[in-house]
Amino acid sequence: MQYALTVIFQSILFVQCQVGEAAFVISQEHEVSKSISINMTLFPSIKWIIHKSFYLYLTYFVMSQQTLPCFQAADSYNYSHSLPKVQFARFSKYTPQSISYSSTQMYQQKEYSDHITEMTNVHKSRKRKLMVTEDQWGSQITIPKVIQNRPLIEKWFVQKRFKMVKVRNIQRPQLSYQLLSALTCLNSPDGMISTTEIYSFILHHWRYYRYANENWKNSVRHVLCKCQLFDVLQVEGLSRKGNVYKLKRPDNVEKEMIDVKTLGCMQKDSRGIDFYIKMLAGQIGLPRHLFYSIVGNEMPEYAGPENSAIFYHLLSMRKIIPKLETRYFLEHWQMEHKATEPMFFEEFVPYSTSLVSCVENISSYGEGVGPGNDELYDLSDRQIICFHKNIRAYHSLQKRCHKMNYSNWMTPSLIYVQEAVMDKEIVEDDIRNGTIECEGVARKEEAKKNFQDPALISIYN
C-alpha cells in the first residue's frame, strides 16, 4: 500500500496546482527540479484524489521517520520562474557577475539564501564556496572577484602558424648537439642545466639556429635522453623544476666530443679558436635569463648579445618594453658576434607572473638612473641603431665598471652609456636603411687567415 501511494505521488510530483490559490516548489535530495506552473480547473474527484494522496504521502514519511523533502511556498500566485542557475567564470578570470530578481519573484530571503548556498556547494568540487551577498532589496547574488596583479612585462607569444621565418643564407655549424649541450653545461655556474638554458645558449651564440626549423630542439632533447655522457637529475626547487642534466666527466669533453671535423669548424668560425677555448674553460657564462624567457625563445630572430644588452639597458632606464614591440631590436644575421660580452653571474629564475608583477624582482630595473629619479626615458631610432652598432663599446664599459666594483656594472649609468656609446658617430645609411654591417673587421681577418691542417692542431695550442 505504501509503495502504491508513493508511486501515485511520484507521478504528480513537480506540479503546482492552484488549489486554494497556493503554489508549491518541490526540491528532492538536494537537486533543484524544474518548476512547472499549471493553471487549470480540476474536477472535484481529481482534487480529492490529489489531496488524499498528498496527505497519505506525508503520513508515510512521518511514520517511517524519514526526512521530509524541502517545500517552500511562493508569495505570489503567478510565480513561474525557475530557480536561477548560477554561472561561474574560470578561477583565473573571475569577474563580478550578478543575477537580479523583482520583488514579486523572490522567496523569503533567509530561506532562499540558505537554499541557494546549499544547492551550489553540495556534490560539487570547488576550491572555494559561493559567497552570497545581498543588496538593500535582498535581491542580488554576486560572485566574488579575485584580484590578480597585472605583470609589468608580458611574455611575448606568437602562434606557430603565424610565425614567418625568414630564409637566410647561413651555413649550419658542424657542431653536434651533444657538444653544444656540453658547452652549455661547462658554462653553467653550478654545472647543471635545463633544456631551456640549452636553447637560450645556442640561440645566443649561433645565428643559424635563429632561422632554422624548431625541430632542432627535439634533437637536443633526444640527445640528452640517449647520450651516456650526461646524468639526469630530478630537482624540485625554487629555480628549477623537472629534469636537469649534468656532465659525468666534464674534463674529458675535448677527447670525447671534438674530432677533426669539429675542430676544423671551430677554426673557420669568425670568432676564432680562442672563443671555443674560453667556452671549454667555462669563461663565457650563460646568457641572461629574463630576456630569453620573454623575447628570445619566442622570437629567435631577435636573439643574440646585442638585443639582450639593449633589453636590459631599457630596463635600467625604467622603460618597460610593450608586448611584441620590436622597434628596439634588430636582426644580426650577417656575421657572428665577436664574443666581447662579459661573463654574467645570475641565478636561473624561470618566468612567472608573480616574478614580473613587482619591479623589485626584475633584474637591473632602474639601476641606470639611480634611486629617487622618477623620470621616464626612452630611446630614439638613431640611438637604437647607435647602440647596436657600438655594442663593443657597451661591453667594454660593462667590463670597466666591473673592475671598479660598481654594483650596477651589468647595466651602467645612463651618463656613462651616453658618453661611451651614444655620442659616437654612425653612418647615415645605417639610419636610413636600418641595417648594420656587423663585425667588418672580423670579415677581413677571416679572409686573411691561413688555416693549417686540423689534424695537426690541438685546441689548446
Curated annotation (Swiss-Prot):
Any GO CC annotation of this UniProt entry: nucleus
Q: What happens when the gene is disrupted?
A: RNAi-mediated knockdown causes significant reduction in the expression of 21U-RNAs, upon simultaneous knockdown of fkh-3 and fkh-4.
Know the name of this protein? Putative forkhead-related transcription factor fkh-5
Q: Which Gene3D superfamilies match?
A: Winged helix-like DNA-binding domain superfamily/Winged helix DNA-binding domain (1.10.10.10)
DNA-binding residues (ranges): 171-262
Give any Pfam family that matches: Forkhead
**What's the domain of life for this entry?**
Eukaryota
State the Gene Ontology BP annotations. Answer: regulation of DNA-templated transcription
In which compartments does the protein localize? Nucleus
Alphabetical list of PROSITE patterns matching this protein: FORK_HEAD_1 (PS00657), FORK_HEAD_2 (PS00658), FORK_HEAD_3 (PS50039)
The parts of the chain that form a coiled coil are none
Sorted keywords for this record are: DNA-binding, Nucleus, Transcription, Transcription regulation
- Function summary: Transcription factor. Binds to DNA sequence motif 5'-CTGTTTCA-3'. Regulates expression of a class of small RNAs, known as 21U-RNAs, perhaps acting redundantly with fkh-4 and fkh-3.
**What are this entry's molecular-function GO terms?**
cis-regulatory region sequence-specific DNA binding; DNA-binding transcription factor activity; RNA polymerase II transcription regulatory region sequence-specific DNA binding
Nucleus: is it a keyword of this entry? yes
Gene encoding this chain?
A: fkh-5
